[in-house]
């Protein structure tokens, strides 16, 4: 900056702080990328110097001859918060602020400029001193940073300074806690790398970065490279030898050489094969991936300091890949390959000899590189590649400092790294605060865009002026020629935007959408001046932030390189009228050489080749041509390993020849030959003639200024052997092959290798012989399948050639056939099972000699799995049998014959008892004829009853019966009755009866009755019966009854019965009855009944009766079930109701007698 108010030395606390920031862009030469370095020069000493460990500041003053005799004491005053107002919580949260001690000046006093939040007292009457420049040792721990910091304060500004610029009043523009921009869609641009201040001597402010070769100049035009492929290869080879570390390059005394973008993008490879023109990510195997940020120590991406993000990936390419196939490399969405230019074309993948393996294209929208393979992959095999890609934080997607998880991917395989994004802070001195970066380089239009933040901390600044200089500036703000420049004149595009109080500026110092800010460019039409390649904008008094966008022209150097520098500074006056300066200088300098020289292209390096011959060494002597049957071997894989570990492979041609070219003198290579299947390597160095011998499977060779075509190797066919022998029937089961024992044919034999893989299957011939042929030396396993109907014999009982080896055995081939693997089997014996089913008449479960067998009983046989393997029926003697059974577990199931009942089981010995309906049995080397079963027939009933009954009964019965009965009755009755009766009856009966009866009856009755009866009966009967009965009765009854009964009966009965009975009854009754009665009856009844019934009844009966009867009846309580156990009925009422039951039975028999009498009389009448 030029001090136009006082061209002599500034004498009052005048210091300038310099910041040198670098800007990384990508420049493509010979398929590689170059870094263009930028630096920033800062005016206004600030606290930011503390961030760079090596930064120092120098305080200098020029003596003013006109004022040295007139110095007055300076009254020191405190300026509180001189650099902290409006920025305590702003995203631009750090200030670089430096203060100088006060120096005496004759005409004025002033307060000192202070460090942030500190008070400093100035002294007075200090003799002015000449400002001297101090050389500072350059910093080397920031790759592309070169900063110097100095502060200069000018003489009090003229009184009319405040009147030069009228500032637009702003409404409430306080400091805000963050600076933000509206989100914008990603756009492709090149990144600017700005670094924090580092001290350098003020006389050396340039940065030079070698983009291709740090040792020698390379002056080759793009046209020459296109027309000269060999020169292109040479440059790539030079690049592969370049030291790509991040250490500084020795150039100018204080320059620091940063890493080259994409300088490490080297690939070593060898060939694939696949399907044409498709993505083959699945055929790419990633072996290593790493992400490194800057120096890799703290993972901090200092986006304004030129710190790059380095992505290293190593991968192999499958041999299936073919020309035209593609693979992908993905950048993280928050990075870009370059943000100063739009040149994002990726480097081609080449091998160390310069052959192109794949060409890449970059998609800005997806941030993805697509590589398309050349015919290289059709010529070579086993390709291994390494790739190093550099990228930078995308300021569009990352506008403010933050933490990110960056993810990169090769062929879809991802790796991630956490990083912290750090942006620069404004330079601050007093109320002056400013920062700037280069944002876009257009090499076609030869323009550079710079964006400047003016007063980003929104301080209240007075007499504000901003200078934009087309060069760097020195410590005093004077233009410094050389080391880059731009053209600043009336044709320079300068736009000014005002930031409202509610808007926040992005910390990235990069604006993509200016429409969100107020365009106030027109307000500076009369407040903008140009002079000596400097534009000055007069802002006047401000308390808002502003953005200046400058698009200036530049002139490339004669060799087409870029020497671009542009500075900007802000000056304001403090309350005493003294100027405070703060500023930046941005510059880009590129060069393709750093070591000097005449700029001519280095003579092309001579390259060499190696190779020769692979042959079949029939006589195994290791010497070519000693046997007429020897011939070349085609399609043998030969792999070359480069000194850096990368490889490529070729196959021998039809003549057995191979060759590798493009090899460098003095370097050591390794050649490996893959042993073809079915061959073995021959003898090594079988002769002293290096042109005729075999060098073995692997040979190392060093290039000594000439080709080496003597690297040969020979192979011979591996001999083959047989394995096998014999499978025989071991009739005596001794495990030894006897002369009279025959072979077994069609036995399956399986051969497996040492890994268990089946390599052959065969069957024995008619003699029991088998053989496997064409086998190599090694261990094998033989498995014999047991033939149907045979059992394996004992093994290993005698010598190998005569014994049995077992179902699975191991055989070893060692330079000879192995015909000792035998196996013996004997026929498996069969067994029978069965016995007898009989009629167990006495139901004791034992087979008695008098009991007979039951024929046609179905018997089923099941195996252990429950599968039916046989069904038969017993013969006329009750016998059954199953034959041809193996040892094992079985189940025998007997089907019960109709009408018969299963007898009791397991009552005696197995061969005489009954085993039940289902029997489990195990056969172990013998027959089993003990599986028997017995059945018996249920009993029937025969009853003969003769009853003569004379009964006079007066009965009062009270019965409570609950009965559940299901009854099925079929009755056929034929009755012929002739009755003459005269009856006079006076009966008074009170009966309460509730009856539920279900009856099915078929009755045919013909009755002729003449009755004369005189009966006087007074009966009061109240009967309540609740009966619950469940009865299953099967009865066959033949009854012949003759009864003569004279009875006078008066009975009143009330019964409530609920009965469920299942009864099957077949009754044939013939009754002949002749009855004449008027009377008084005396009844004697004798009944013998045998009944099997199951009944449950609850009965309550109260009876008053006078009767005489004799009834021998089996009590119901002694009725038995099918287990022959007494089954008692539940008690219902009093136990002395026997007489009541007798009366009821007496009445029943009297009625039966009358029926018989009537029938007899009728017959007599007939």
Swiss-Prot record:
Bilayer topology: Peptidoglycan-anchor
Uses in industry and biotechnology: A combined vaccine containing IsdA, IsdB, SdrD and SdrE afforded significant protection in mice against a lethal challenge with S.aureus Newman or any of the clinical isolates NRS252, N315, NRS248, USA100 and USA400. The immune response elicited by the combined vaccine is greater than the one elicited by its individual components.
Positions of region (Disordered): 54-230, 904-1141
Biased composition (Acidic residues): 908-918, 935-1105
Residue ranges annotated as propeptide in the record: 1133-1166
Coiled-coil annotated spans: none
Region (Ligand binding A region): 53-606
Domain named CNA-B: residues: 607-719, 720-829, 830-940
Compositionally biased residues, Polar residues: 118-129, 179-212
Bias type Low complexity, positions: 77-90, 166-178
Gene3D superfamilies in the cross-refs: 2.60.40.1280, 2.60.40.1290, Immunoglobulins
Subcellular location: Secreted, Cell wall
Gene Ontology biological-process annotations: cell adhesion
Motif YSIRK-G/S signaling motif: where in chain: 23-34
Sequence motif LPXTG sorting signal, location on chain: 1129-1133
Cellular component aspect of the GO annotation: extracellular region
PROSITE patterns reported in the protein's UniProt record: GRAM_POS_ANCHORING
Keyword vocabulary terms for this entry: Calcium, Cell wall, Peptidoglycan-anchor, Repeat, Secreted, Signal, Virulence
Residues recorded with modification Pentaglycyl murein peptidoglycan amidated threonine: 1132
Comp. bias (Basic and acidic residues): 61-75, 92-108, 130-145, 221-230
Assembly and interaction partners: Interacts with host complement factor H/CFAH (via C-terminus). Interacts with host complement regulator C4BPA.
Purpose of the protein: Cell surface-associated calcium-binding protein which plays an important role in adhesion and pathogenesis. Contributes to the resistance to killing by innate immune components in blood and thus attenuates bacterial clearance by interacting with host complement factor H/CFAH and modulating its activity. Inhibits also bacterial opsonization and killing by interacting with host complement regulator C4BPA and thus inhibiting classical complement pathway activation.
Name of the protein in question: Serine-aspartate repeat-containing protein E
